[in-house]
From Swiss-Prot:
NCBIfam families: PRK05751.1-3, PRK05751.1-5, secB. It is found in: Cytoplasm. This is Protein-export protein SecB. It comes from the Bacteria. GO terms for molecular function: unfolded protein binding. Homotetramer, a dimer of dimers. One homotetramer interacts with 1 SecA dimer. Its main location: cytoplasm. InterPro entries: SecB, SecB-like_sf. One of the proteins required for the normal export of preproteins out of the cell cytoplasm. It is a molecular chaperone that binds to a subset of precursor proteins, maintaining them in a translocation-competent state. It also specifically binds to its receptor SecA.
Length: 159
């Protein structure tokens, strides 16, 4: 094999909106409310190996806005990407898939959610940046804690 074939390779094959739903259970009455809504945001990351060097990474976001105890809207979206990753050492592969790939996908998710919210007739909500490295490290710590409690072997990966 030549040196070129052994070089680390990272390529975005595709970025796509995998799933999105928006519910407005209290429309149109909710539009008459004068109080500011409270907003809850949840984000999650999942990854799946599709082939030897091909991974699908999905960043999911859920935004719930409530006025008093009434739901103004609930939006759930999944932004996905297919990544071709080759010749990356195993110890670097999991962080690449768990940190770098979600960081690439999140701006698309944020834009799609903001667009859907405004198209639904609500003022825009802009999701703050997310530190996917901190999220990854938090999940890794949880897995290590679970592995220690269950007596699982070391080397368990997130993806």
């Amino acid at each position: 094999m030549s040196d070129v074939e052994n070089q680390p390779f990272f390529n975005i094959q595709r970025v796509y909106l995998k799933d999105m739903s928006l519910e407005q259970p209290n429309s149109p009455a909710i539009f008459l409310e004068q109080d500011m809504p409270s907003v809850e945001v949840e984000v999650d990351v999942k990854a799946e190996r599709l082939a030897e060097s091909v991974f699908e990474v999905v960043v999911s976001g859920t935004v719930t806005a409530k006025v008093k105890d009434k739901v103004a809207f609930l939006i759930e979206a999944k932004q996905a990407g297919i990544f071709d990753i080759r010749n990356i050492p195993d110890e670097q592969l999991d962080p690449l898939v768990g940190i770098a790939c979600p960081t690439i996908l999140f701006p698309y998710l944020r834009s799609n959610i903001a667009d859907a919210i405004t198209r639904a007739g609500f003022p825009p909500i802009h999701l703050a940046e997310i530190n996917f490295q901190a999220l990854y490290e938090q999940r890794l710590a949880q897995l290590q804690q679970q592995a220690g409690a269950a007596g699982a072997p070391n080397g368990t990966t997130l993806n």
